[in-house]
């Protein structure tokens, strides 16, 4: 087991055996323990009472946080050439048709998000094995299959992103950076929690949230009381 540094031991001591019922206090500790020499990503880990192997217990949706997550993403658009100008003017970083499909098939993926128009989806189907594991396959549910490229690109450029529960029913998602203000992190986390809550799968029975933790890239896990947002 890797030996903990003095800083890590001190940070863990601050959160050991604590469950925070006050959001302001939790965010304060979160920022106090973000002591790495780089700007750390801030994450929520929500353990949900779901079994994603059942279709009615799957969680996959999009959200736009009030203050973004502090990340600029590269967006590629797959469409026919009649839409190239619109996509470029709307801010797409890469626009293509069959040429883009060929690049992807060769493993040349230089984008963080892929948006496609419906007419291109049959051609894209063969790349499911390449894009699927990376979470890059466009889908109507995530808003990445669209006929309104200008509006869709605007939303994602403003910080809209997709998140989903993993096979164990846990959502791992960023809600900002350690250099965000206290209020920005509080507002982002609250908005993210509400999004997860509002998209509760229809097949969930009983309690939805099992546990909630927040942390920074190098910081300790901070457990939140399940009633903290009430």
Swiss-Prot record:
What CDD domains does this protein map onto? Ribosomal_L1
Q: Name one GO molecular function term.
A: structural constituent of ribosome
> The organism sits in which domain of life?
Eukaryota
Q: Does the keyword Ribonucleoprotein apply?
A: yes
The record's GO CC annotations read: chloroplast; large ribosomal subunit
- Keyword field: Chloroplast, Plastid, Ribonucleoprotein, Ribosomal protein, RNA-binding, rRNA-binding
Q: Write down what this protein is called.
A: Large ribosomal subunit protein uL1c
Species this protein is from: Trieres chinensis
Q: What is the lineage of its organism?
A: Eukaryota, Sar, Stramenopiles, Ochrophyta, Bacillariophyta
């Amino acid at each position: 087991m890797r030996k903990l540094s003095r800083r890590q031991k001190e940070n863990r001591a601050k959160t050991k055996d604590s469950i925070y019922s006050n959001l302001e206090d939790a965010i304060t500790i979160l920022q106090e323990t973000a002591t790495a020499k780089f700007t750390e990503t801030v994450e929520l880990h929500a353990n949900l009472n779901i079994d994603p192997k059942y279709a009615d217990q799957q969680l996959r949706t999009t959200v736009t946080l009030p203050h973004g997550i502090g990340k600029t993403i590269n967006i590629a658009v797959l469409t026919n050439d009649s839409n190239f100008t619109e996509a470029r003017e709307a801010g797409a970083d890469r626009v293509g048709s069959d040429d883009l499909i060929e690049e992807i098939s060769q493993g040349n993926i230089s984008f963080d998000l892929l948006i496609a128009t419906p007419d291109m989806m049959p051609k894209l189907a063969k790349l499911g094995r390449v894009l699927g594991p990376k979470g890059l396959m466009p889908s109507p549910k995530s808003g990445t299959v669209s006929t309104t490229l200008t509006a869709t690109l605007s939303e994602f450029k403003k910080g809209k992103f997709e998140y989903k529960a993993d096979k164990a029913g846990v959502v791992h998602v960023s809600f900002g950076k350690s250099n965000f203000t206290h209020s920005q992190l509080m507002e982002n986390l609250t908005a993210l929690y509400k999004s997860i809550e509002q998209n509760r799968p229809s097949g969930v029975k009983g309690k939805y949230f099992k546990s909630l933790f927040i942390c920074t890239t190098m910081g300790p896990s901070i457990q939140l009381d399940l009633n903290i947002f009430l």
